[in-house]
Amino acid sequence: MKAGYFTLAAALMMMCWSQVQAGVVVGGTRLIYDGAKKESALSINNPDAVPYLIQSWVDAQEGDSAKAPFIITPPLFRLDGGQNNLLRVVRAGGNLPADKESLYWLNVKAIPSVEKKDNTLQIAIKTRIKLIYRPQGLSGNLEEAVGKLAWRRSGNRLQVSNPSPYYLTFFNLKLNGSAVAGSTMVAPQATASFSLPAGSGAGGSLSWQIINDYGGTGQTFTSTL
């Protein structure tokens, strides 16, 4: 009986895993828009057998009422099974800072094509990635920007100041080996604050990595408080 339960459980897990793997694949976790170019592109792939209706758009950051100054072509199209396409992102005006990066959100919604049946639920899959506009001629690079970060403790908070013109996204930020929860990113020429791990005393050693333009991580950086 136990072996039967294990077999059934394994089969259910494999079914769930297949569903997770199915669907439209967006070619990146972020898109860096080079201000020196007229457009940027993002690949969309459909490894499924069924077609999807793809809808895409760009949002401003939460709390920003201004319309995002980017358009996507094509904004709505059918993507058949086994096919791929490119989303072309084009800047459409907007008074963006020339001395630092600007952050927006690129949304891709994939709606599967299914036969119309009673009592069926159609589920759309939405993917949201960072769209970072990088003005032409910014000084330095991400690696140099990391070296300019200034860390300090403020009560039970960890503060980091970023004087560089780049958005820096943290990965695996730790204090004395304990993960710093909620440590996401710090905007250019700004300060971010995160909760310190429970029980962390005065001082300590920090370690972290930065997510690069391609969504990967590089070397581990260290600092002391």
Task: Report the location of each language-model feature.
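Beta-sheet-dominated interaction scaffolds and their linkers
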Residues: 22-43, 141-150
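Short acidic, flexible loop segments centered on an aromatic residue
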Residues: 47-65, 163-180
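Bacterial N-terminal signal peptides that target proteins for export
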Residues: 1-8
